[in-house]
């Protein structure tokens, strides 16, 4: 059985805290525009050529190339060179930021201090400009140990004009793909699902061609809420499981759990119209093992999830959960290739990848366009 092989491979892919020498000759998930696969056929062909063998994983282990050590107060160490952030810029970045301030809108890009903000907002190498808008306010009712968003048991009520303001702003920006996410709103009777649905529907009316990913909270597993958002007209239903099953209680708020999140993703696949993609994401460097990661991938794929992303956890402040280790680009690429072999339609995996990373959205856009072209011919 193929999954048994994945688990055998994972046991040979050991985590380590010993530093190793990283050079630019190492293969990473970042490529130049000339090397970037331009469609899914090219991507799958490249993955087939570069499919990892058992010896690749054993090599990572023996060369201490799975992860590097995190510094401490007594033994400070610099971040690995691959974790250095780029400075945001570009005219489209400036335009979007100005409009956000005028309309008092929030983006998770800014709230979470995402390192890819400039690339995503400006279009980057692929030309697919994206942004991640956060609705339902900027204060969450939950307190996950990794998250930098403000928290409160009683946040201010949602702005009734927000769906209209968000839709009009996004429609004016010339974006190809937008991610709409929200804080958790356990204080609301419907967990904010109606507000989410209204925002998606109004944006689709103003700009039917835009692709919308809704990155939603778990709605406490409420099927009615999940169904409402799944049928709102979105193109991608995303909900993040955040970490492996074994670390859920240590990383996420006590009201969240692995099985509830998987149920949300399963329900979305059942409720959403045919052709709607489902997506999830996990952070690495929280103390998980390779074997736990592979087992989690198996369960996520069994839930029918189409797209999965992997990124390095970065500690927002000293009051947040510490980073356990920095996973290397080589290890991230192995997870990407294993994910494609498992049957995910796309896997974005790299140290700087976030759940709404635009390189992934470029391929998701290609998948949606391809699926719709086939559907229109049948």
Curated annotation (Swiss-Prot):
Keywords: 4Fe-4S, Iron, Iron-sulfur, Metal-binding, Mitochondrion, S-adenosyl-L-methionine, Transferase. GO terms for molecular function: 4 iron, 4 sulfur cluster binding; lipoate synthase activity; metal ion binding. Pathway: Protein modification; protein lipoylation via endogenous pathway; protein N(6)-(lipoyl)lysine from octanoyl-[acyl-carrier-protein]: step 2/2. It is an enzyme of class 2 (transferase). Its cofactor is [4Fe-4S] cluster. Residues 125-345 form the Radical SAM core domain. It is found in: Mitochondrion. [4Fe-4S] cluster 1 binds at residues 109, 114, 120, 356. GO terms for cellular component: mitochondrion. Binds 2 [4Fe-4S] clusters per subunit. One cluster is coordinated with 3 cysteines and an exchangeable S-adenosyl-L-methionine. The keyword 4Fe-4S applies. It catalyses: [[Fe-S] cluster scaffold protein carrying a second [4Fe-4S](2+) cluster] + N(6)-octanoyl-L-lysyl-[protein] + 2 oxidized [2Fe-2S]-[ferredoxin] + 2 S-adenosyl-L-methionine + 4 H(+) = [[Fe-S] cluster scaffold protein] + N(6)-[(R)-dihydrolipoyl]-L-lysyl-[protein] + 4 Fe(3+) + 2 hydrogen sulfide + 2 5'-deoxyadenosine + 2 L-methionine + 2 reduced [2Fe-2S]-[ferredoxin]. [4Fe-4S] cluster 2 binds at residues 140, 144, 147. PROSITE patterns: RADICAL_SAM. It holds the Pfam family LIAS_N. Its EC number is 2.8.1.8. This protein may be expected to contain an N-terminal transit peptide but none has been predicted. Belongs to the radical SAM superfamily. Lipoyl synthase family. This is Lipoyl synthase, mitochondrial. It comes from Medicago truncatula (Barrel medic). The lineage of its organism: Eukaryota, Viridiplantae, Streptophyta, Embryophyta, Tracheophyta.
């Amino acid at each position: 059985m193929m999954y048994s092989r994945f688990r055998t491979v994972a046991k040979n892919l050991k985590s380590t805290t010993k530093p190793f020498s990283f050079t630019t000759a190492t293969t990473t998930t970042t490529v130049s525009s000339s090397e970037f696969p331009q469609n899914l056929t090219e991507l799958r062909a490249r993955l087939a050529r570069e499919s990892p063998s058992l010896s690749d994983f054993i090599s990572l282990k023996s060369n201490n190339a799975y992860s590097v050590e995190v510094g401490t107060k007594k033994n400070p160490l610099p971040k690995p060179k691959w974790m250095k952030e780029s400075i945001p810029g570009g005219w489209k970045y400036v335009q979007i930021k100005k409009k956000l301030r005028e309309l008092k809108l929030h983006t998770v890009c800014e709230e979470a201090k995402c390192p890819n903000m400039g690339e995503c907002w400006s279009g980057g190498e692929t030309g697919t400009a994206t942004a991640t808008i956060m609705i339902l306010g900027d204060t969450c009712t939950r307190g996950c140990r990794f998250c930098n968003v403000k928290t409160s048991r009683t946040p201010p009520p949602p702005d009734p004009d927000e769906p209209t303001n968000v839709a009009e702003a996004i429609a004016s920006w010339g974006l190809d793909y937008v991610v709409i996410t929200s804080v958790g709103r356990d204080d609301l009777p419907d967990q904010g699902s109606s507000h989410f649905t209204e925002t998606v529907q109004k944006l689709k009316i103003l700009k039917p061609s835009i692709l919308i990913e809704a990155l939603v909270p778990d709605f406490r597993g409420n099927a009615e809420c999940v169904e409402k958002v799944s049928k709102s007209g979105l193109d991608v239903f995303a909900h993040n499981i955040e970490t492996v099953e074994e670390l859920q209680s240590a990383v996420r708020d006590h009201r969240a759990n692995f099985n509830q999140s998987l149920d949300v993703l399963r329900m979305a696949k059942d409720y959403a119209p045919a052709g709607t993609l489902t997506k999830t994401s996990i952070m690495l460097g929280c103390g998980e093992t390779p074997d736990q990661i592979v087992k989690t991938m198996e369960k996520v794929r069994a839930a029918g999830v189409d797209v999965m992303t992997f990124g390095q956890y970065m500690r927002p402040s000293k009051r947040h959960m510490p980073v356990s280790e920095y996973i290397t680009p080589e290890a991230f690429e192995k997870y990407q290739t294993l994910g494609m072999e498992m049957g995910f339609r796309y896997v974005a995996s790299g140290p700087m990848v976030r759940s709404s990373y635009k390189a992934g959205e470029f391929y998701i856009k290609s998948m949606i366009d391809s699926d719709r072209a086939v559907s229109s011919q049948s």
